[in-house]
């Protein structure tokens, strides 16, 4: 057995289906076994995949064992001279495996090989090549300095941004999405460390490879599609916790105790700061309208009080303790009433907006008339303090909905500007599918070989110009219309903003993902 391919799957059956078809094509003529370890998926992966891939060795776990442990399960079964650890949401070009194996033959000191990766839109994934996460490197990444100085050898060392992504290079760390390694090297350094549940296991493995005297190489002569990339959202608390917990484990394992303790303290402080900033950012992003409402209400009420005390009723001290309590009571009550009527829970309903504000204002005015006579001079303050924010908040909400509607409308219209890259037979199948799902309204036509019964808009080499000419926003690539290699090369030169989806001959789905930070989407072919 020359090659064993190990894939860990968790709830991405449609992506794995496309992956397996591409892997089978890439391994033609090579003595290969494919082992899939499923970490207790709940999406029906077993019943969907097993009938279509009879030669694949599936292992179905009863629990989510984690990435490292699942890979080790596959490794225990692997018989190949070389091992390829591969993510399920990838597509390989036809010559990828052969090129990688040939590269190993050129240098017997290569310990492991990573590869150039792009996302579903053809954008280079910078995690394809990385440096070791030293304390300084981790902090630069944590606080965003790597993003501010993307070409700096110092600040952007984590992603080795100073090295060209189109040239082969020796690197420190390979991405776990694609690692090819000789079985003899694994016998020498050991398997994945199962203490790493998610993140860090590839860093640890890469470190041990170098420590044993081998070299890690980034291979740019072939490019694969990795749909999700680092799919966990980088601003989420879960990502911050998992990533830097992995860094802590890495430091404890590979640094001496005294130095490790100091580094871990720094990392813990950095994690807390990053988590706090992330929480504030997410809170503001999620509750921007309520925050604006609070600011508007406070500003208008206090502005009204200031105006009234200086120009209308100068003899009244509106900032006395009792009056301040009354005013702030009305402010708080106004906010509570607005929230109670689901102002923020149903923020897309303009009728709900008016209803919540009107009811809140009426209730406050009713309460005002129940106030003692000796503070009736607050009438003007409360009246303007209620009506003015009501008007301002309504205008802001109307503008917010207007902008949101426009964005949604544009996205909907863009999705309909679709071209299908396929031969005539496959084009008809895809077109019928889109008609059933209501997505065929603006399918402009087919890209492929000339056919008198179904003349194409052009061939795949003309695709960039056709996209610009017709303002295409979505392309469905069918593998039988062109090779995976040609498709991957094409998406890398398409204009920005084009959404790509992929369909492999024989598969039952169309998959795609707009960027590395978004979950993928799919269409099922029935």
Language model: regions and residue ranges:
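Short aromatic/hydrophobic "clamp" motif used to bind/position activated sugar donors
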Residues: 83
């Amino acid at each position: 057995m020359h090659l064993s391919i190990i894939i860990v799957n968790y709830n991405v059956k449609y992506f794995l289906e496309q992956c397996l078809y591409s892997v089978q094509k890439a391994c033609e003529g090579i003595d290969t076994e494919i082992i899939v370890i499923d970490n207790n998926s709940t999406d029906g992966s077993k019943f969907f995949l097993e009938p279509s891939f009879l030669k694949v060795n599936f292992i179905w776990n009863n629990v989510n064992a984690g990435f490292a442990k699942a890979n080790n399960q596959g490794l225990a079964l692997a018989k190949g001279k070389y091992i390829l650890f591969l993510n399920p949401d990838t597509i390989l070009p036809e010559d990828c495996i052969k090129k990688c194996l040939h590269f190993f033959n050129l240098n017997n000191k290569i310990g492991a090989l990573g590869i150039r990766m792009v996302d579903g839109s053809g954008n280079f994934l910078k995690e394809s090549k990385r440096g070791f996460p030293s304390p300084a490197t981790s902090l630069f990444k944590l606080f965003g300095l790597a993003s501010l100085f993307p070409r700096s050898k110092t600040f952007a060392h984590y992603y080795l941004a100073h090295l060209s992504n189109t040239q082969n290079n020796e690197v420190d760390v390979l991405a776990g999405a694609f690692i090819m390694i000789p079985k003899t090297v694994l016998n020498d350094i050991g398997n994945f460390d199962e203490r790493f549940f998610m993140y860090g296991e590839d860093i640890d493995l890469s470190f041990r490879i170098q420590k044993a005297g081998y070299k890690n190489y980034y291979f740019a002569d072939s490019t694969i599609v990795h749909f999700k990339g680092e799919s966990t959202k980088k601003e989420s608390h879960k990502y911050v916790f998992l990533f830097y917990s992995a860094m802590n484990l890495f430091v404890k394992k590979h640094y001496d105790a005294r130095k490790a303790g100091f580094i871990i303290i720094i990392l813990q402080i950095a994690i807390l700061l990053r988590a706090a900033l992330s929480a504030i950012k997410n809170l503001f992003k999620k509750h921007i309208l309520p925050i604006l409402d609070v600011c508007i209400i406070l500003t208008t009420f206090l502005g009204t009080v200031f105006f009234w005390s200086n120009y209308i009723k100068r003899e009244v001290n509106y900032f006395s303790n009792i009056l301040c309590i009354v005013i702030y009571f009305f402010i708080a009550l106004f906010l509570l009433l607005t929230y109670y009527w689901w102002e923020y829970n149903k923020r897309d309903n303009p009728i709900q907006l008016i209803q919540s504000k009107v009811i809140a204002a009426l209730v406050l005015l009713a309460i005002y008339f129940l106030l003692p006579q000796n503070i009736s001079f607050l009438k003007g303050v409360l009246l303007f303090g209620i009506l003015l924010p009501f008007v301002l908040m309504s205008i802001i909400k109307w503008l917010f909905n207007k902008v949101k509607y426009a964005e949604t409308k544009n996205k909907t219209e863009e999705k309909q500007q679709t071209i299908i890259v396929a031969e005539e037979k496959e084009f008809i199948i895809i077109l019928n599918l889109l008609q059933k799902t209501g997505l065929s309204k603006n399918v402009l036509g087919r890209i492929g070989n000339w056919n008198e019964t179904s003349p194409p808009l052009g061939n795949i080499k003309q695709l960039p110009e056709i996209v610009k000419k017709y303002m295409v926003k979505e392309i469905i690539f069918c593998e039988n219309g062109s090779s995976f290699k040609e498709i991957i090369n094409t998406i890398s030169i398409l204009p920005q903003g084009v959404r790509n989806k992929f369909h492999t001959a024989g598969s039952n789905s169309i998959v795609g993902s707009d960027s590395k930070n978004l979950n993928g989407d799919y269409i099922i072919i029935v």
